[in-house]
From Swiss-Prot:
Interacts with WRD11 (via the N-terminal and the central portion of the protein); the interaction associates EMX1 with GLI3. Transmembrane segments: none annotated. GO terms for molecular function: DNA-binding transcription factor activity, RNA polymerase II-specific; RNA polymerase II cis-regulatory region sequence-specific DNA binding; sequence-specific double-stranded DNA binding. Pfam families: Homeodomain (PF00046). It comes from Homo sapiens. The keyword 4Fe-4S does not apply. This is Homeobox protein EMX1. GO terms for biological process: brain development; brain morphogenesis; central nervous system development; cerebral cortex neuron differentiation; cerebral cortex regionalization; homeostasis of number of cells; in utero embryonic development; neuroepithelial cell differentiation. Belongs to the EMX homeobox family.
């Protein structure tokens, strides 16, 4: 009885102690997978669209998704090209040299990847052409030529809607724009001064005679006078306006301050006579001190 009873107990003791050792390796990967912290995702399109590789890989330690997450987490975020260069001239060189190549070949990451946003006229502009010194293999720190140099001052190709909608303040043609005066034409540019009419001596003589007869020439008379002098009615009207202003100024200069004082005194006397209803008998000298 003792030998039969002691043998199973000695055989069962190592069995109970070895049972947990056999189960731990099976449950350890599951527990580690359950409590494994999720990898940080980046802000790139690949990391946002990619699926989580931890759930799909099972107990195999992750799959292709884990590699995508690791690559997305270690990938450098998008930043402007100018921030990668410490010197301003280097940033300008990188912009001028890298923009046309990236836009033409479609290489690199762009915020506006649509092909409809690229204007062919702008890409063919000489200011955006790639300099031979800025091609692949050259140093990006070499400063380029000036963007607004003398060679880039050619007139731009104006679109029809610019010429039609009077965007520049007045209607003009693209051929009228000078080579070096393109920046002077803008919506806030001053209008050119009106050209003064140069009258001939015979025209001035006839205009002066017409002004002596009548200071105001209107209607058919002005039309007839303009036709006889080979002038427009507007030119004749403006000349008469200026001539009347000159006539009034000359008359005031000839009369002087004494005539103005007499006018003021006679004006007060006329108001007094109208108020008292007295007839105009004698002229009162308003300049005397008596």
């Amino acid at each position: 009885m003792c030998l039969a009873g002691c043998t199973p107990r000695k055989a069962a003791a190592p069995g109970r102690g070895a049972l947990p050792r056999a189960r731990l390796p099976r449950t350890a990967p599951a527990a580690a997978t359950m409590f494994q912290p999720a990898a940080k995702r980046g802000f790139t399109i690949e990391s946002l669209v990619a699926k989580d590789g931890g759930t799909g890989g099972g107990t195999g330690g992750g799959g292709a998704g884990s590699h995508l997450l690791a690559a997305a987490a270690s990938e450098e975020p998008l930043r402007p090209t100018a921030l990668n260069y410490p010197h301003p001239s280097a940033a300008e060189a990188a912009f001028v040299s890298g923009f046309p190549a990236a836009a033409a070949a479609g290489a690199g990451r762009s915020l506006y990847g649509g092909p409809e946003l690229v204007f062919p006229e702008a890409m063919n502009h000489p200011a955006l052409t790639v300099h031979p010194a800025h091609q692949l293999g050259a140093s990006p720190l070499q400063p380029p030529h000036s963007f607004f140099g003398a060679q880039h001052r050619d007139p731009l190709h104006f679109y029809p809607w610019v010429l039609r909608n009077r965007f520049f303040g007045h209607r003009f043609q693209a051929s009228d724009v000078p080579q070096d005066g393109l920046l002077l034409h803008g919506p806030f540019a001053r209008k050119p001064k009106r050209i003064r009419t140069a009258f001939s001596p015979s025209q001035l003589l006839r205009l002066e005679r017409a002004f002596e007869k009548n200071h105001y020439v209107v209607g058919a008379e002005r039309k007839q006078l303009a036709g006889s002098l080979s002038l427009s009615e507007t030119q004749v009207k403006v000349w008469f306006q200026n001539r009347r202003t000159k006539y009034k100024r000359q008359k005031l200069e000839e009369e002087g301050p004494e005539s103005e004082q007499k006018k003021k005194g006679s004006h007060h006397i006329n108001r007094w006579r109208i108020a008292t209803k007295q007839a105009n008998g004698e002229d009162i000298d308003v300049t005397s001190n008596d």
